[in-house]
Structure formats: structure tokens, C-alpha cells
């Protein structure tokens, strides 16, 4: 599949590159970044490499997936935003989830909203997704605010069976 790149005011959303592994692994080794992901466990470099490989396979199979997100000004990787299948939450399947994760230095600058807006528009307009969900663990209200800013509404409150943590599921339906 041809490369996809989306440029926003401050960000570039693009496919993953080999040189992304080290900054991605560093982000996923930060306990504060990983606090609200699954059971809150940090990831090893090997797990991160596998995640990038899986993301690229997802792209090849579906024509969309997780974008690596870099700052346009510095061309440094600051996180990701895009699409995955939330198989960890069987009660909402089948679904496509929009997700994001950013390095701590990128928090509070509006990057998650900027990236998620661009990715969501790509999924709905360019790839014809009809419904997209997003999930956050109760306590991580910053992610909930991003969901609301990009036009999503609360759909369900439930428990993540893999972590036992309460989560809120938001969705948006393209009419």
C-alpha cells in the first residue's frame, strides 16, 4: 500500500519507519505514559517492535491503522494516533477504535486533539469507516476530553475484562 501522510498545523501523521523504534520504546517504558494503558505495565523494546510490525500489517490488510506522529518543526516522534481493533473489550465488537499515546513532553499542547482529529477525518472520509469508538480508563479524563473535542459521545460505561479497570467507551457515527 502506498504511503499515507497527513500534515496538520503542527504535526505530521505518517506510517512507521525503522528509526521510530527507539523513541517509541522510550515512550512505552515511561510508567506515567503507560499508567492508563491496559493494566498499566510498561513495555519492552521487543514488545514495541512487535507492536509496530503488527500495526504495519494492519495497515497493509485494511488500508488504515496507527499513524506515527511527529512534530513538523523538529521531525521528532512524539507518539501515535490512529486505528486498531479493540479486541480486549469483546462486548463492543466488532468495532474500530481510534487511539493515541504521546510522550509526556507532548502532553497539554493539544497534540492529541490535533492528531486524533486528522486521523478520525481520514478514517471517516478517506476510508469510509461508518462508526469509530474510543475507550479510556476512568481516571484518565484528559483522554475523555479529547474524545469530546473530536465530536464523540459517551456510548457505554463498563469494565475492561483484561485489567479489571472501569472504562468509558465513546463513539461517533458517520451518517
Question: Where do the language-model regions lie?
Answer:
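Conserved GNAT-fold acetyl-CoA-binding loop/helix
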Residues: 32-54
